[in-house]
């Protein structure tokens, strides 16, 4: 169980008397530091000094230990030496990464001028510095601090009058969502969204139930006063950010949703120090459009990680065949929120079917996609003012590949590369296209919709291609990333920089011709700069030569032309870098004009990546297209567990589930695997993926519930049995007639009669009240009697064979009731000594008698 990391728990003792420190005799630099630190008490302050970011006082003590760097001292304050440590500015991101992962917030203080510029303001003036940004777990945008295929959400939860809202955004991609929720659903929402940082009011955590929920997650918690979430303030923040008068023009918001969204935007404004990010209009997440997977099911089904916290062995590790970062992120969103609309699901399936049938098209598209960088995140950095030449170059490459992809899709639509998939379209799937000024007809295939959403970025690509050199430069201050031919002034400066020696030599030759002195030289030193030198025996009479210095054996001169050339050479680099920075800023403005269409194209690329990835998965793993409709069917022929079958020989099993299937059989026979595989097949189908089976017909499922395995929840103070009862209570209280429930044992943590009574009552309730599809595995053979009076309960068992005193598990699910649980045999497999096994057999026979 992971603990919450509260950012405000770090106390800065040195700042308790901050103002008295400032009044003490400190150096101007230390006074500047202390004044800035007083504004960011709950942050580690990275204070720029030359080529290093320095940390002082308690910050230094903490950082040195956490980052494993040397703790030293610098000067004195209040008669005590000041602890100090530092990290090189050029490699600071790796240190930031570690601190952010530990839940710290870091305030970045940069130099706003050079030392020479500071001296112009006065001899004793120090370099101006200020905090330029605040880096927190939920607001990072740097590639080196992010995982390519994982979202990095900042979320906010607000409660007012027992109404709850949660809003979440990702600064690195511009995604922004909000939804109404409830205290009961909050746990599931947090697990689905998986935010890195959560913004809440100080009052919010006074509720014991809230604290109990939050303890289950490794989330950086940022607390603010209730006024930070105030309605009128949040409403104003939203309107000002999107430059609108009424919020109704961008969506429907409840009062509490406005408070959650507005607080997020205000927090972004504070942390970004005035830089305006690119954020989409907040989209309403409507739970009724998606399958709800309860908290227990998300964990037990190992969708994203195993019970040991590893990605390998999870469902995502098997099904992720995406080749783009944005496709990988969208796949995780789809797995977290499968669809609950048959038409929308079939829209996805039809496109995947097309790529299953058309190998060459699938291969070509995946080849192009694999060479497309993460333009979504590069775009966000460029708009926020933190983009690098590398980001601009990646955007250029991405737009070029998008044009190539668009041309290939034109061939598909013209029939050159196969027939278009069945024409489905769902209006909610294409709303973003409408906002970007793209008209999408209601009778178009999804592939056509994706094609149109890619847009035409030829003009912008050609502009960037003519301006940007291929590079991996992380800072515009380095220069050397703009084509010299793009700008005539830059071309001249580049010529000077690249040919300075040639220009000096050319001028020297012209002076030799003018004076007739073959031994004339042009030399350079730090005192005179460039100068003309001749021996003392030669006399120069031309008026263009200005005497500079007389030596015993030589005479030195300069000329206006030489001074001008020297000035050009000395200033060319600074001028070139300054000009490149100006051009870069202009290019960023051009990118900003197209940002909405670029973001739409990035989303279309992600969708296309997933559809082709699903096709690749289906072909490689022998998956079949499921039939999805609005019936209540659950008929799977020869279904397989998508994860287990990858590494082991797998026995397929069928199921035709119309009510409740009660499954008996020994441990290790495969009951739990059978339960999980059917839930996973249902989830895959609702994502729009093919499934591991010979055939599958599934009526839309609104919710999936799981009670499979149980452990103590020590942090909440719950025993194994209590956890089991809470999970079961969730099922009987929330399951509908369109839900799928899988239960693996109920009542094991109490007395036999108690457990049996509870299990039977649950089955009867699910049958008579919930009326949902359910698979119930049990060791209580007495439960099978319910099939005699509950018409929709059928009994199944796992087939076993006894041979020469041994029990062989065949892993086949057949109709019927298991004779025994074979627990003693499993104990033998586990390595019990013979004496214990023999005694267990004796006791077993006595109990049977």
UniProtKB/Swiss-Prot annotation:
One GO MF term: mismatched DNA binding
Protein residues bound to ATP: 665-672
Pfam families in alphabetical order: MutS_I, MutS_II, MutS_III, MutS_IV, MutS_V
Biological process according to GO: mismatch repair
Keywords: ATP-binding, DNA damage, DNA repair, DNA-binding, Nucleotide-binding
Record SUPFAM superfamilies: DNA repair protein MutS, domain I, DNA repair protein MutS, domain II, DNA repair protein MutS, domain III, P-loop containing nucleoside triphosphate hydrolases
InterPro entries, sorted: DNA_mismatch_repair_MutS (IPR005748), DNA_mismatch_repair_MutS-lik_N (IPR007695), DNA_mismatch_repair_MutS/MSH (IPR017261), DNA_mismatch_repair_MutS_C (IPR000432), DNA_mismatch_repair_MutS_clamp (IPR007861), DNA_mismatch_repair_MutS_core (IPR007696), DNA_mismatch_repair_MutS_N (IPR016151), DNA_mismatch_repair_MutS_sf (IPR036187)
Keyword Nucleotide-binding: yes
Lineage: superkingdom: Bacteria
The family this protein is said to belong to: Belongs to the DNA mismatch repair MutS family.
Function field: This protein is involved in the repair of mismatches in DNA. It is possible that it carries out the mismatch recognition step. This protein has a weak ATPase activity.
The protein's name in its UniProt record: DNA mismatch repair protein MutS
The organism of origin for this protein: Wolbachia pipientis wMel
Primary gene name: mutS
